[in-house]
Amino acid sequence: GGNDFMRF
């Protein structure tokens, strides 16, 4: 749960 900024 959180920001998916570093999801590739």
Swiss-Prot record:
Keywords: Amidation, Neuropeptide, Secreted. It is found in: Secreted. The modification Phenylalanine amide is found at residue 8. The keyword Cytoplasm does not apply. In larvae, expressed in the CNS and thoracic perisymapthetic organs (tPSO) but not in the ring gland or abdominal perisymapthetic organs (aPSO) (at protein level). In adults, expressed in brain and thoracic-abdominal ganglion but not in corpora cardiaca and corpora allata (at protein level). One of its GO terms (cellular component) is extracellular region. GO terms for biological process: neuropeptide signaling pathway. FMRFamides and FMRFamide-like peptides are neuropeptides. Belongs to the FARP (FMRFamide related peptide) family. This is FMRFamide-like neuropeptide GGNDFMRF-amide. It comes from Delia radicum (Cabbage root fly). The lineage of its organism: Eukaryota, Metazoa, Ecdysozoa, Arthropoda, Hexapoda.
